[in-house]
């Protein structure tokens, strides 16, 4: 998916009915009526970093019908006087450990006559370490459109993303006779471990 940089991009997602997936999530609002919203935001963002990375868009309502639950319906702007970009950044940095490098928060004004009504876009890179939600002391990972607690092996797998074997393969193609086919002996003169 291309980076979302304008209201036109948002409208294109809605018009095309681009469904949520592992790398895209819609949130209709940021409910700050209780303190649970901080833990929920930390869970959503850390889960996406622990999976493949992706984008969370705050300010898009999905359809209520079960069969269309993950499809965007319409824009539901977030009021910046209630939740600012700085507040979101603070919640993320103080509730996820370690901090997610390369995370970006952007803000799109929905209607220029109402500058306090915005959509927040959080672009989350795939991480090379596991991120913990400090509110729950758990590690989460996004699977398609759901978020689950991670198993021990999944946490270890994420922490080893930067470790790759150094393998070089050399091939030689040549035409062989039928008789040579039965006598092929592999050579390993360039095998490095």
Where in this protein do the model-derived segments appear?
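Mixed-charge intrinsically disordered linker/loop segments at interdomain junctions
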Residues: 99-184
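Flexible, active-site-adjacent loop/turn segments at secondary-structure boundaries
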Residues: 24, 28, 73, 132, ...
């Amino acid at each position: 998916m291309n980076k979302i940089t304008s209201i036109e991009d948002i409208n294109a997602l809605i018009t095309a009915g681009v469904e949520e997936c592992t790398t895209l999530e819609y949130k209709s609002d940021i409910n700050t009526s209780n303190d649970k919203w901080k833990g929920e935001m930390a869970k959503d963002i850390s889960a996406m970093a622990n999976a493949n990375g992706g984008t969370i868009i705050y300010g898009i309502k999905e359809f209520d019908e079960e069969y269309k639950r993950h499809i965007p319906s319409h824009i539901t702007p977030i009021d910046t006087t209630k939740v600012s970009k700085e507040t979101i950044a603070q919640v993320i940095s103080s509730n996820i450990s370690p901090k997610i490098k390369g995370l970006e928060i952007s803000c799109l004004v929905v209607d220029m006559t109402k500058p306090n009504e915005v959509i927040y876009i959080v672009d989350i890179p795939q991480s090379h370490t596991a991120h913990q939600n400090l509110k729950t002391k758990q590690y989460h990972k996004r699977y398609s459109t759901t978020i689950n607690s991670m198993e021990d092996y999944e946490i270890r797998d994420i922490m080893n993303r930067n470790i790759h074997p150094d393998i070089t393969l050399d091939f030689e193609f040549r035409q062989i006779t039928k008789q040579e086919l039965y006598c092929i002996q592999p050579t390993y003169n360039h095998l490095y471990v």
